[in-house]
Amino acid sequence: MQFSIVVMAALASLASAQSMDGIPTCALQCLAQAVVTGGCEASDQACQCGPAREAITAAATPCLLSACTDAADLATAASVGNGMCDKYKMGGDDAAPSPSVNTPAAAAPYPTAPAPNGTVPIGTAAAPSPTANTNETTTVATGSAPQNVAGGLAGIFGLVVAAAFAL
């Protein structure tokens, strides 16, 4: 069970790295092969972060554990791949944007009253508070954009490394 949770959390990190910087050479072939086994193109993060996530992780994990015997290599790769699918799903770095969201406004934590002589009473802020407005809606177009091969592979490696540490 713990392995599955870590694998899913790691899989959620598939889409932000845009280069192979920091990915150990021992991992490259395993990752490339796992992406193909999962049925995705190396540059297709929509596939890697979606329907093929479990298949890619299942294919890459035993290979990486065998090929990368240095724990430091696994840890380094995990830090590089961290956050990739989350970033992809949030629309970061050439990723497909997420659909629009309408969030209700948060209530003020306490009422405020004007202060005499332009001072700010304790417990209030001079700058506007970061609360949402119920009348505001953020709309973002949906779609996908090609990603470079390194970004997809780095994210998958981060997933597999996290899974390995959970064992």
UniProtKB/Swiss-Prot annotation:
One of its GO terms (cellular component) is side of membrane. Disulfide bonds join C26-C68, C30-C63, C40-C47, C49-C85. Transmembrane segments: none annotated. One of its GO terms (molecular function) is metal ion binding. It is found in: Cell membrane; Secreted; Host nucleus; Host cell membrane. Heme binds at D44. Keywords: Cell membrane, Disulfide bond, Glycoprotein, GPI-anchor, Heme, Host cell membrane, Host membrane, Host nucleus, Iron, Lipoprotein, Membrane, Metal-binding, Secreted, Signal, Virulence. Residues 18-112 form the CFEM domain. It is a lipid-anchor; GPI-anchor. Residues 144-167 form a propeptide. Induction: Induced during infection of poplar leaves, with highest expression observed four days post inoculation. Glycans are attached at N117, N135. GO terms for biological process: biological process involved in interaction with host. It comes from the Eukaryota. Its main location: membrane. Appears to function during host infection, and may play a role in suppressing the host immune response. The CFEM domain is involved in heme-binding and contains 8 cysteines and is found in proteins from several pathogenic fungi, including both human and plant pathogens. The CFEM domain adopts a novel helical-basket fold that consists of six alpha-helices, and is uniquely stabilized by four disulfide bonds formed by its 8 signature cysteines. This is Effector CFEM8. It comes from Marssonina brunnea f. sp. multigermtubi (strain MB_m1) (Marssonina leaf spot fungus).
